[in-house]
Amino acid sequence: MAETSSSSSQTTPETGTYAIVEASGQQFWVQPNRYYDLDRLHADVDAKITLDKVLLVKNGDAATIGKPYVQGASVELKVMAHRRGQKVIVYKMRPKKKTRRKNGHRQELTRVMVESISVGGKAIS
């Protein structure tokens, strides 16, 4: 049986640079040069957004944990597009009655690209 070895140049969650940020009342694990869907933000397409509520920053082997936030840490985002999520169907029915209600909902989302993670004004990615 052939052995497989993983390349050390790949960015994995254990060895790479990442941050855990708070946005839209949720926590997101973000890595540079990846995109994420957040709840709709009031920003134009191609606008830059800075998130200052950073809970954790990991750079290689060094990790910085905030209490509750890391001081001087920020994540730079670029708004790529405004979009809508998948449709969720809500169906309510009362048995033995002629009561049925069907509603659909699509969440308004903003797709953002993580451009950089910085601590103390110095970009680490």
UniProtKB/Swiss-Prot annotation:
> Looking at the record's lineage, which domain of life comes first?
Bacteria
Q: Supply the alphabetized keyword list.
A: Ribonucleoprotein, Ribosomal protein, RNA-binding, rRNA-binding
Q: Does the keyword Ribonucleoprotein apply?
A: yes
Q: Some GO term, biological process aspect, for this entry: which one?
A: translation
The cross-references to InterPro entries, in alphabetical order and at most eight, read: bL21-like (IPR028909), bL21-like_sf (IPR036164), Ribosomal_bL21 (IPR001787), Ribosomal_bL21_CS (IPR018258)
- Specify whether Lyase is a keyword of the entry: no
| One example GO MF annotation | rRNA binding
Protein family according to the UniProt entry: Belongs to the bacterial ribosomal protein bL21 family.
Record text on subunit structure and interactions: Part of the 50S ribosomal subunit. Contacts protein L20.
Its name, as the record gives it, is Large ribosomal subunit protein bL21
- Species of origin: Synechococcus sp. (strain CC9311)
Gene encoding it? rplU
